[in-house]
Swiss-Prot record:
Start-end of Low complexity biased regions: 156-165
GO CC term (a single one): spindle
Single Gene Ontology MF annotation: identical protein binding
Post-translational modification: Phosphorylated in vitro by MAPK1.
Single GO biological process annotation from the record: meiotic cell cycle
Compartments where located: Cytoplasm; Cytoplasm, Cytoskeleton, Spindle
Protein name per Swiss-Prot or TrEMBL: MAPK-interacting and spindle-stabilizing protein
Gene that this sequence comes from: Mapk1ip1
Biased composition (Polar residues): 176-189
Region (Disordered), start-end ranges: 13-238
Amino acid sequence: MYPFIPPARLLPGSPAPFLPSGPSCPQPSGPYPGPAVRVPGPTRSYVSTNVPFPELPRPNSAPTDPVGPLGTQGSMSSGPWAPGMGGQHPNVPYLFPESSPTPPLPVSGAPPVAWVTVPPGAWEPPAQYPTPEASYPSPGLQPSPNNPYPLPPGPSAASPGPGSLHRMNEIPGGSPSDSSNPESTLESTGQKKHLKLDNKSIKRRRSKKKSKRVTWGDIKTLTHKAESLGKQQGHNTTDPKMMLLCLMTMLHVNSQHESEGSK
């Protein structure tokens, strides 16, 4: 397998070449197998497995050369094969004796136009859509069929402007009441306006008078009056509880006098 190289001739006086006693490479150890022993004999070349297979029978008498024509379905050749090698390509379709049907036309019936073609004539932008005709009526005030409070025609239907005098107690569909009489009622419309509660007239609250500032002199005077009142009734004024009772009585009497004087 490798060419044989003869050893170099030794010159006289030159040292002898170093020759190892054992093999040049150590023997492998482990699970790996040792080197194969070469058997003496003639060496043969390696035979490749890429050889042509024998021709197989094709159905419908189809040609075996993939380079040749395969009918209306085109050629399925995969390379420059020589005739007679056998077209065993897996993608070669089987041929049928009848011809393939014609593909149907589009639904519209017009022939297909390639996308690269341009129709003859100068190109112009598309025309604008026509403006719709004014067939709808103009919006306006339409009377409501289910209006429970129709406005009567005339100047009275207009709403009062700002600053104008108008009656606030008018009710739609009824007669306006007399605003001069506060106790008048709307008998015609079935509605009544009560201005009295529990048959008692409403009174205005009187403004409270500012209370007088209490001084120590007022406290001494009130205490002296309470002590005199307790002595007149025979109570012991030295008792704090009794003195407090007399003082509360004196305050109650003074409040009664003030209320009677204000009336």
